[in-house]
């Protein structure tokens, strides 16, 4: 049986791998001037990190999170039919998103003591969700994101959105083809009453709505705004709106965010039905869509002022966002663009006889030590076959070493496009190559 990748996963090779690397480079170039520093968290966390942070009632925790068990613990789970008897440190999961893990790092290491400098971090990591694989939805996918803890001011919300749109611009998006949606989800003071209003609205229309929405009425009624059923969406269009139920503090926070965005020239659309799928969001939420690309949201985020406390820390404001690599790449391609990284020009060193391989080996090492991408023959090909291989790997130059050239202390340097050819001194081969790349 031929080995195959798991369903819902992709191999990042060639141009796609270079695109992922380029996205990470762009992320560093955009986020670091704002004071953000790179962070990497474990792919495996204790389940409670996500249950407390994302929310027990969310689809991510209930339906999509991959659980991880060692051999012995897996046997116990199969035998007992539950993992509740395992110790917390034995109940593990693959991270489905980045924020909860970063917050766990902050809480565990006390990185935002009261009155300290805010904690700013960005990440580029693989995430895992047990979703039904389809276009733009994978079981292992990649995200670039930022987390800003210790910044309650609405200016931080606006600055995150400004960073996000600048990131899309650097990726190669025409921002006029993107749509930024914003909303406020209120906070612990005003959202509970609103949640009850939406719950009652769904119950009043239960016989008209899908099974999933009826289930959500008890667990997470606001998620009904995200239902993909057209009839449910029509019904939810008449539901009470958070904007009509904001407390004075949340309303003023939201208005200030909009004023900052207006001052920065950021175009946005207010969407009073916009909710995020994770329970930790408070106040400002935002998403970026690529209409016409067929991939839905390509990124989003918001404020999460209660998450640090949920993870066992002291009350600390937070805000952040994440961008899906695979979806962003699909959207770019739909718009006729790409994220292909510029490859360094390649040099191929060919030998005119097996007896010259040692000399070719020395030349390749010298070129590589100088940072020049260099290929050579390792299969005993003929000179003609080496020329074909040089063309196949996209070499800009081919260096040909024959017995006569070696005796004269020279090497032929040939441009693969123009076919211009010169003899260069072996003692000066690096400079000769650089002049022609």
Predicted regions and their residues:
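TRNA-recognition modules of translation machinery and tRNA-sensing kinases, especially anticodon-binding
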Residues: 1-437
